[in-house]
Amino acid sequence: MSVGRGAPPGRGATVGYSGTPLVRKLGIKPGARLGLIRAPEGFDVTLGELPPGVRIRRRLAGEPFDVIVAFHTRRAELQRRLPRLADALDPAGGLWMAWPKRASGASTDLTDNVVRNLGLAAGLVDNKVCAIDETWSGLRLVYRLRDRPPRRP
């Protein structure tokens, strides 16, 4: 499945009207622990240049993540994986759930409402939406302040 053209090396992708670099849209800050889960081929180029000290992991094991970007195309799979994704998230972090846009032509049974409802069932609420690229939409899920688990090392 295509993830769009991507951005030239050293520049962040800007999709949509905002002109905001993707790294900024996703809230990736210097020193962040970034999880890229099931990222499509070429996503590193689409993401663009990262802030200093960002540590990328592609598996959920290890210390909690500040930002996770997880790509899914099927509701059943997302529903099965969401509790583990939420558990891997730092309590103050953000979990970006990405699914193919309807206009991309990719086969999917996910929509923003499906992702939002699955997030709510897992104890997370949405607080941002983002056009990741020409193929993928994203919804940021976070723990409510009152529901945040204790911080882990």
Predicted regions and their residues:
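Short acidic low-complexity segments
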Residues: V54-F65
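N-terminal, charge-rich interaction modules
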Residues: R5-V45
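A short glycine-rich, Lys/Arg-flanked "PGG" loop and its adjoining helix->strand segment in the class I
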Residues: Q79-P91
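Conserved beta-strand signature within the Rossmann-like core of class I S-adenosyl-L-methionine
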Residues: P91-P100
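Class I S-adenosyl-L-methionine
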Residues: G123-P153
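Short, glycine-rich nucleotide/cofactor-binding loops
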Residues: I68-L78
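Conserved Class I S-adenosyl-L-methionine
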Residues: D109-C130
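Short histidine/acidic/glycine/proline-rich micro-motifs that form metal-
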Residues: K101-A106
